[in-house]
């Protein structure tokens, strides 16, 4: 149920962005004169990830921190290189997957890490970039920091941008809460299921 709700929340934010910043429905279909095309680096900081100090396939007390790869979690390590709210996309290998993190993690050296005071607006931009046109690699796909910084985007006035962040942020706060609940439920399942299968946990006396 949470996954369906989250899909709907993401879709609502995407439709809102399209309505305001692509179809210009706030201004009768015309781009306002006080909006301007600028480089992505004017609203976002873009950096590369780093190679983790160690890598484990298992999440435990020694390696509790997820290592973020170009498209997904690729392992676990002992320390974080980010504790802030970040957006992550692939630098080497897989391109076009945008990941959100708001908890300690280690962004690997095949990622680009994006931070911005306009987090939700920047997220929508990243989800719409044509990454294939930026690829510099021949045998292995590669996108550079410099190319990402120079992506031209339409920047609205501060008031409109703040309103979008408020609306989109409230929807995505619900999304994050649902994601946290899904993780807790998965951990509970993974803890209880082996005990049920082995008979260690007896539920025969429970009335349903």
Where is each model-derived feature located?
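Non-catalytic DNA-recognition/assembly elements of restriction-modification systems
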Residues: 1-68, 154, 158-204
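DNA target-recognition domains and sequence-specific DNA-contacting regions of bacterial/archaeal
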Residues: 31-32, 36-158, 207-208
């Amino acid at each position: 149920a949470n996954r369906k709700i989250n899909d709907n929340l993401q879709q609502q934010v995407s439709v809102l962005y399209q309505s305001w910043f692509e179809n210009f429905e706030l201004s009768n279909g015309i781009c306002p004169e006080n909006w301007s095309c600028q480089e992505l680096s004017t609203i976002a900081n873009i950096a590369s990830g780093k190679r983790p100090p160690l890598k484990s396939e298992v999440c435990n007390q020694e390696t509790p921190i997820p290592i973020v790869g170009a498209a997904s979690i690729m392992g676990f390590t002992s320390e974080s290189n980010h504790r802030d709210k970040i957006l992550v996309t692939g630098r080497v290998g897989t391109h076009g997957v945008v990941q959100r993190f708001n908890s300690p993690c280690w962004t690997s050296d095949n990622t680009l890490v994006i931070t911005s005071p306009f987090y939700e607006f920047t997220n929508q931009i990243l989800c719409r970039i044509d990454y294939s046109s930026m690829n510099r690699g021949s045998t292995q796909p590669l996108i550079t920091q410099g190319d990402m910084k120079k992506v031209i985007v339409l920047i609205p006035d501060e008031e409109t941008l703040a309103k979008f962040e408020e609306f989109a942020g409230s929807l995505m706060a619900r999304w994050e809460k649902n994601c946290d609940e899904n993780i807790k439920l998965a951990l509970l399942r993974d803890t209880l299921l082996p005990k049920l299968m082995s008979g260690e946990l007896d539920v025969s006396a429970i009335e349903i």
